[in-house]
Amino acid sequence: MRVNGTGIRIGVAVLALGLSVFAMSTALEAQKAAGIARVGWLEVCGPGPKRPHFDIFRARLAELGYVEGKNLIIEQRFADCRYDRISGLAAELAQAPVDVIFTMGTRAARSTAQTVKTTPLVVYSCDPFLHVKNLARPGGNLTGVTCMTTEMMPKRLELLREAIPTVSRVMFVHDAEAAPNAFKLTQDVAPRLGMTMQAAHLTGTEDFLSELKTISKERPEALLVYPDVVLSTHPRPQQLADFAIEAKLPTVHAFRFYVDAGGLMSYGATTSEIYMTAAEQVAKILRGVRPSELPIQQATRFELVINNKTAKALGIKIPTSLLERANEVIE
């Protein structure tokens, strides 16, 4: 009898693959039997040197009874700031499988929702109406939390007018795919404030510094920045702040970390509340609540932060009345 070596090798490989799949399936069943929850964390960029948002999310889950390393496994995936990788990573988490997937950012939320149709999703989106029609009853397999950034853009423009009454030409800095509604809202209110709006689409890629330089050619008098995930990732907030100070451009943002980096002013939700609320949504799903029954939660805590050191560097005197209303003034 003649034995074919190639056939034996293929047979062994198939057997090994089968045993591997069986072992993985057995391990998953054992985890379920032991009451171990599996949560998918899908991040556009990261992980950075510091992960305050992940730490807040994990700590809140622990307070709610889900402790990593004890009865919780967090499967993490990172897209290296490439949106074209989100769908594949979302599918990978769904097939792992996990009990629920959490992702952040409007574009990432949209890609994940388009890919994953059965695994429960909790999303952090600045514009939730791109995903659902009704915040109270989102339906389907998706719920989440919104920082209400889109709705707050006109308010930020009003604060800019109050801080610098003479400003008229404002550049709306954004990722076009993440902020279709925000720019229109801002355009609608600008004439009432005596302002004209232009838009600059920034991708936050390796050519970010070159993209910033193109802004100067349009000669804006101020920048209104929409917080895309990539634009919010280290070191881009610092690069944006350095560019704006050098170009003598005041900037208005949605989140305080831009102002900590040197931006002029921010008004928006506190990110700690956002990630704590997201963790609470995840915990409810782990306990058996269907995402369609969980209203998308809106931020309730907002803060105004002004960097007076930056204002002085720009030659701007912020009105005392505005400084007194700020939650924090950086000197």
Language-model segment annotations:
Residues 1-331:
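Short hydrophobic alpha-helices and adjacent helix-cap/hinge residues
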